[in-house]
Amino acid sequence: QRQMCIRDSNPSYEELENSYLDMVVAGTEKAVLMVESEAKELNEDLMLGAVLFGHQEMQAVIKACTELKQKAGKEDWVLNTDEETPVYSAELTEKYSEQITNAFTIKDKTERTAAIGVIKDDIVSSYPDADEIQLGKVLGAFKNLEKDIVRKNILSNQPRIDGRDTDTVRPIFIETDVLPSAHGSSLFTRGETQAIVVATLGSSRDAQRIESIEGQSTDNFMLHYNFPAYSVGEIGMPLGPKRREIGHGNLAKRAIKAVLPDVEDFGYTMRVVSEITESNGSSSMASVCGTSLSLMDAGVPLSSPVAGIAMGLIKEGDEFAVLTDILGDEDHLGDMDFKVAGTETGITALQMDIKISGINESIMETALVKAKAARDHILGIMNKTISKPKELSENAPAMKSFMVDKDKIKEIIGKGGAVIKSMQEQTGATVDINDDGMVSVFGQNQSSMQECLAIIEGILEEPELNKVYKGTVVKIVEFGAFVNILPGKDGLLHISEISNERTENVNDVLEEGQVLEVKLIGFDRGKMKLSMKALIENAE
């Protein structure tokens, strides 16, 4: 059970860090216009209550703005009445209503767009003497007619553009592990919207460094959303991400953040890329579903799967219809884009944009209830494909963290970093050590990590008297040879301990780089004394 409180002022940065909800609400005196939020699996009643509370609290600011307008504001502009557009609207309605109505019964987006294009070309050709301004008014009347026809059909309980009723989610197709070499991947298709989502795991060093007005920080979870022109049948230069792509990526990221494991439990840096290959409504929510699937496919221990759905609204006067899983045309011709993402337990992200003067509590409540039903439906399909995180992929990097005594840190690092650099070059692994003695080993694969761990274990191991070690000759001197038996630990094999027989010249018996077995027979002022002769005597 969660205990919560509501503050009547803006929260501090510290409070937001520990808050279950971060929400921005914009509106007028009478209605809500925009909501942007992220949450930690809150139920629909709490989210609705937060929106209404935000609307209530903004009234003081609205009142102050109204008072300022009365004191210092200017008169409102009076727009000139456009007398031509209504005439064009009447002409187009009489001649093209039936054709447009039939076009909007075509379920396939490409075919429907082509049919609408033919009608549009016919309209343009029927006004050969129209100048640019007049033609603009004609096309404006055409768009209004499109909008009126689609909206009236929906409000009169007729099938939507693709034949669905207001509550049905489009057919969903899901695959995971579609890119076997990737750490995690998924293909999420809902109707004519499709996303290929790939998850990549990296070390803590791969975390994104952020400098903001709040200070410096790092982010171990990155989500990049790409919307290429071909996904909507267009062409264009693949330049850097635009505002829309950044916004959609941030929304999907906020939806997933609530279910990510703590850094202490899962030290990987996670990067997800959602590539939209086809789009006809709510590719951002497809990215949410695909991200959840790909992270679980990569073995990331999410606390719960996350799904997202986009809701729409058609409103005329007091009549309204809330649409589940809107198409691109329904988004364009409708009054609201209401995106809800979350788990079976609750909502993790909510975004709402309104094109009309605002919506009331009843509409928001209806939208949230319908979104919950749709989200549960999608989660049910997702869980049939993958219901819990897999084991880490063989292609994924391997990582292990453990604590060591603080006085051992310098031994692992070595003088001038020599030991840790050599270790990383030899194994290809990355080693991070913090001041508390937390050591994190990150290998390109299991064997790389295990090789590095073995070296560290050797460094931490204390030489044991009378134990036999396999060592490497690192240096030959006149009186013997120095043999490395543990990482960073060399002992002296005296010339008298090489053999039972007298050895005149060490170079006649040993050479640098030679691997041999030696026994630790004692310590001389902290220095290790090694023997090969002791092994021969034991064998005899």
Task: Name the predicted role of every residue range.
Residues 72-75, 79-86, 377-403, 450-470:
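Long, charged amphipathic helices and adjacent flexible linkers at domain junctions
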Residues 2-6:
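Short, small-residue-biased leader/transition segments that mark boundaries at the very start
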Residues 350-370, 374, 378-385:
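Long, amphipathic alpha-helical stalk/connector segments used for oligomerization, subunit docking
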Residues 77-215, 397-411, 419, 426-427:
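Extended amphipathic alpha-helical scaffolds
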Residues 21-26, 219-225, 229, 248-263, ...:
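Structured alpha-helical segments in the cores of large, soluble enzyme domains
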Residues 9-32, 218-222, 264, 308-353:
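Flexible glycine/proline-rich, aromatic-decorated loop/lid segments
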Residues 29, 36, 178, 183-268, ...:
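Glycine-rich, flexible beta-strand/loop modules in the N-terminal catalytic cores of phosphate-handling
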Residues 395-399, 406-540:
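Single-stranded RNA-binding regions, centering on S1/OB-family and related RNA-binding modules
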